A protein has these predicted regions:
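Phosphate- and other anionic-substrate recognition elements at nucleic-acid/protein interfaces
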Residues: 2-193
């Protein structure tokens, strides 16, 4: 729940960057008085699926979806606001399957957490400053903006395969903060007694 200090509050935000292979998450605190965003936690959920020929693909897809939702359920519980980079469709059937499952998981999150803000991949890239921003550009932007953000490390270095999803989730918060819906939600919390 939001921590209240008079009319000013510290709101807990959870941000998501979802695909069937990786779910990047970032938890943050937004101070309504200073308008400062502090990244408190970063994590990536990567479903583990056994590669067995005897298991049907749709059963593997259900298992992936279960692992993704299970991994985000607890972090979502205490969030005042959830925002997500919503994936876009694709040409291949397999990619569309991933898209459908990802969007369904986000729809479930939006039902559980009505203060849900969706942003597009383009909005995320434009927040970094370029509609063609690479994953490395996004990570560099996050490190410059939030040097203490706990991006996942491997042997003391940023783990690019995990951190790219966490960085996208962090930038999604910044993109969400630019939306009218974010401002409406902040005003609703300020108006609460």
């Amino acid at each position: 729940m939001a921590l209240s200090f008079g009319v000013f509050m510290k709101l807990k935000i959870l941000s998501l960057d979802i695909s069937m292979s990786n779910l990047g998450m970032a938890k943050a605190i937004y101070d309504t008085e200073t308008q400062q965003l502090t990244i408190t936690e970063c994590m990536t959920i990567s479903p583990v699926i056994t590669k067995t020929k005897t298991v049907r693909q749709n059963s593997k897809d259900i298992e992936r979806a279960k692992q993704l939702f299970d991994g985000l359920f607890n972090p979502m519980k205490d969030a005042d606001i959830v925002c997500a980079e919503v994936p876009v469709g694709s040409q291949s059937a397999r990619a569309m399957c991933s898209y459908g499952i990802s969007v369904a998981i986000l729809a479930a999150v939006a039902i559980i957490k009505p203060n849900f803000i969706e942003v597009s991949p383009l909005e995320v890239k434009l927040t970094v400053g370029s509609k063609t921003a690479s994953k490395t550009d996004v990570i560099k932007w996050v490190v410059a903006k939030h040097p203490t953000a706990p991006l996942e490390l491997y042997r003391g270095q940023i783990n690019l395969s995990k951190a790219e999803h966490q960085a996208d989730a962090i930038v999604a918060i910044h993109a969400a903060m630019k939306t009218p819906l974010f401002k409406q939600i902040i005003n609703l919390y300020k108006d609460k007694p």
